[in-house]
């Protein structure tokens, strides 16, 4: 595996890479989901949709949660390049993915035989350093790839099923990977009241495009909130994570997504493939009702997953 890299992917690096491997390879081909489609292997054991482990040892909880749904080798083939997307929007307690959860996923990927592990972001280095995530990534020999917030480094992707969002701008660096692991922290949001697996994919989309999700009065107007949630659901139709690992150990339930805010501590790590089901489960941790989160309903309507937890097999464990 390559050594640690924590630098901006800038214009010079992009031009150099384009000349070296060809612009088509950098841009990728087809819909984004085709890159990681089929990366989930058939699991012959008991079928579990969502694995949940409760405990204060977040590193071990993450491993055990993934084991509940078939183990990391079900999702990460040998010699694959793995893209990881933690939430590092801020550094206040309960607003970012815990370093030990990210460390655990990196180590599982290494044991599965991944040849390259890349943590992707267009957020500033300060966020990664202040949360302790940069140090963990360096210690574990993974790569931190920070992409400049310039249109040059993002690829336009049409959204055929989009109702509100017709085109996304996905970071080109993402296309150099074989497997995508989505690693949000579940928490409050000022507009739609919930951040989880589906909303975390905005971390791959160009910030200017993300701003179009937010209409005037997006924090208070029902129509504007529905527009935000529809854009998020639309974005999810062209990006399909192989695995979602959610930090629900502690998270803010007020003043999200940046914080600081009131913190709830369920001490849970939640994993699964079905984003809609995982988000449906996570919102129950602080009593949010189905009808209050349009994004989950819209994701279900897009056929992205199951929102009725009575139809989902959940296995929980305490350590």
Give names to the regions the model predicted.
Residues 2-319:
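N-terminal and secondary-structure boundary signal
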């Amino acid at each position: 595996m390559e050594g640690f890299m924590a630098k901006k992917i800038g214009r010079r690096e992009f031009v150099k890479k384009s000349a070296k491997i060809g612009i088509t390879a950098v841009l990728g081909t087809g819909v984004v989901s085709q890159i990681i489609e089929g990366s989930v292997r058939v699991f012959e054991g008991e079928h579990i949709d969502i694995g949940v482990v409760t405990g204060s040892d977040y590193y071990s909880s993450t491993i055990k949660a993934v084991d509940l749904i078939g183990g990391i080798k079900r999702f990460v083939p040998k010699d694959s390049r793995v893209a990881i997307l933690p939430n590092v929007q801020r550094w206040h307690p309960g607003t970012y993915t815990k370093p030990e959860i990210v460390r655990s996923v990196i180590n599982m990927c290494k044991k599965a035989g991944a040849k390259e592990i890349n943590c992707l972001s267009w957020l500033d280095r300060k966020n990664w350093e202040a949360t302790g995530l940069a140090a963990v990534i360096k210690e574990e020999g993974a790569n931190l790839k920070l992409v400049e917030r310039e249109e040059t480094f993002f690829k336009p992707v049409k959204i055929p099923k989009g109702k509100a969002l017709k085109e996304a701008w996905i970071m080109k660096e993402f296309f150099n990977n074989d497997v995508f692991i989505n690693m949000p922290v579940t928490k409050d949001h000022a507009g739609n009241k919930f951040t989880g697996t589906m909303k975390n994919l905005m971390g791959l989309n160009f910030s200017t495009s993300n701003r179009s999700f937010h209409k005037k009065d997006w924090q208070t107007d029902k129509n504007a909130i529905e527009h935000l949630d529809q854009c998020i659901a639309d974005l999810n139709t062209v990006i399909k994570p192989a695995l979602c690992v959610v930090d629900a150990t502690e998270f803010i339930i007020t003043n999200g997504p940046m914080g600081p805010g009131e913190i709830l501590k369920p001490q849970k790590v939640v994993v699964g493939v079905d984003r809609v089901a995982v988000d449906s489960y996570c919102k129950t941790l602080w009593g949010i009702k189905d009808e209050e989160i349009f994004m989950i309903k819209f994701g279900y309507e897009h056929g992205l997953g199951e929102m009725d937890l009575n139809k989902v097999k959940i296995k929980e464990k305490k350590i």
